[in-house]
A protein has these predicted regions:
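Single conserved hydrophobic/aromatic residue that forms the stacking wall/gate
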Residues: 1-13
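Short beta-to-alpha transition helix within the HATPase_c
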Residues: 19-23, 35-53
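Conserved short strand/loop->alpha-helix "switch" segment adjacent to the catalytic nucleotide/phosphoryl-transfer site
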Residues: 31, 57-78, 133
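Conserved ATP-binding N-box helix of the HATPase_c
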Residues: 72-95
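Short beta-strand/loop element within the Bergerat-fold HATPase_c
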Residues: 97-109
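Glycine-rich/acidic phosphate-handling loop/turn and adjacent ATP-lid/helix
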Residues: 111-139
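Glycine-rich nucleotide-binding loop
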Residues: 122, 161-168
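ATP phosphate-binding glycine-rich loop and adjacent ATP-lid/helix-beta elements
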Residues: 128-156
């Protein structure tokens, strides 16, 4: 009998968790509908994580999914690292206004563009040591992103503006004759 009560309690806890997770997914499932499952999944996931930490998460999306020049694996690495870095920077910040803004577009000039801006704690200049990726402890992730962008003949740039950090990347949309991307 004691074991049965314990199982019932555990099932109630699990049911509550699943109901909450299902409600979160349902609330956000139609919010992101670019036609690319990787983009939609990452944005939904990080939107929920940001909400859970009282971080504003906003996006402007104008993506033609057939024109994204990154495969799903590459796109996962790029979005995963950039969004994870943004979320981490906001989580460690004590300012009352914290946000992540994502702007993603496949442009008419045949470029896939991702701009991510997030708030962060300003770093005093005398505490910063010269490194390739200023103010970030995520050098390997950004190096993987840079490698993918370079392999696709794109550019990546970041700006530290004290209390905000901006990452801008642009990858040309170049199709080979058989329809696959370079």
């Amino acid at each position: 009998l004691h074991l049965s009560i314990r199982r019932q309690r555990q099932m109630c806890i699990e049911t509550g968790f699943l109901s909450s997770a299902k409600a979160d997914l349902k609330a956000n499932s139609t919010k992101y509908n670019t036609g690319n499952l990787v983009i939609d999944s990452f944005l939904t996931n990080y939107d929920i994580l940001a909400q859970n930490h009282n971080i504003s998460f906003e996006s402007i999306l104008n993506v033609t999914s057939n024109d994204i020049p990154l495969n799903n694996y590459e796109l996962s690495i790029v979005l995963g690292n950039l969004l994870d870095n943004s979320l981490h920077a906001c989580q460690t910040q004590t300012a009352p206004i914290r946000y992540i803004h994502v702007h993603m577009v496949t442009s008419s000039q045949k470029h896939f563009i991702i701009n991510i801006t997030n708030t962060k704690t300003p770093v005093l200049s005398h505490t910063v040591s010269p490194v390739n990726y200023p103010n970030l402890s995520h050098g390997y992730g950004l190096e993987n992103v840079r490698r993918i962008v370079d392999d696709k003949h794109g550019t990546i740039h970041w700006e530290d503006e004290g209390d905000t950090f901006i990452v801008k990347l642009m990858v040309p949309i170049i199709k080979k004759k058989n329809g696959h991307y370079m």
